[in-house]
A protein has these predicted regions:
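Small/aliphatic-rich secondary-structure junction motif
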Residues: 3-48
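Short, solvent-exposed amphipathic alpha-helices that sit
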Residues: 21, 59-71, 94
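General small-molecule cofactor/ligand-binding pocket signal
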Residues: 36, 83-87, 138
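Acidic, proline/glycine-rich short linear motifs
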Residues: 39-66
Length: 146
């Protein structure tokens, strides 16, 4: 039923809960897993961090790659085929486009991510993916309070 599973991550506790659910689902279906993290670089351009020659965009890409690498290691440890990628741009549209590109059968994501402003029940990225995507979304609730 599920041959290709997309697990977006941002390293948050909610994403970690979703990752565990996604790994369990992939194991049950012997599915291929795609791990993605979106570096939402937005209008930062070549903004430099104080005392650092690294641009804010480069720092975001680096953090995104760390999140991807950590989850790829966990998926590999579960004995599953996995591909990891860092996407750039608005997370909502990038995740939907990538899911279509890889032919995902399901997207497994958390109720919310690292965003500074929390919505009452669900994060804006998750909400957007559910509302505007054509691919089924499994939302894993971490059970923690906002």
């Amino acid at each position: 039923m599920f041959d290709t599973i997309l697990i977006p991550t941002d390293g948050s506790d909610h994403a970690e809960t979703a990752a565990e659910t996604g790994i369990e689902l992939a194991t049950a279906h012997d599915a291929t897993v795609h791990v993605a993290c979106v570096a939402d670089t937005g209008p930062l351009g070549d903004l430099r961090l104080p005392g650092d020659a690294t641009s804010a965009e480069d720092a975001m890409r680096g953090r995104a790659q760390e999140h991807v690498d950590a989850l790829v290691d966990r998926v590999e440890a579960a004995g599953l085929d996995v591909t990891g990628t860092v996407l750039e741009g608005p997370p909502e549209s990038e995740l939907l486009e990538y899911a279509q590109e890889i032919g995902a059968d399901v997207i497994v994501m958390g109720t919310r991510g690292r965003g500074g402003v929390h919505r009452m029940a669900m994060g804006s990225v998750t909400d957007h993916v559910i509302r505007f995507g054509e691919i089924p979304v499994l939302v894993a609730n971490s059970g923690s309070n906002p």
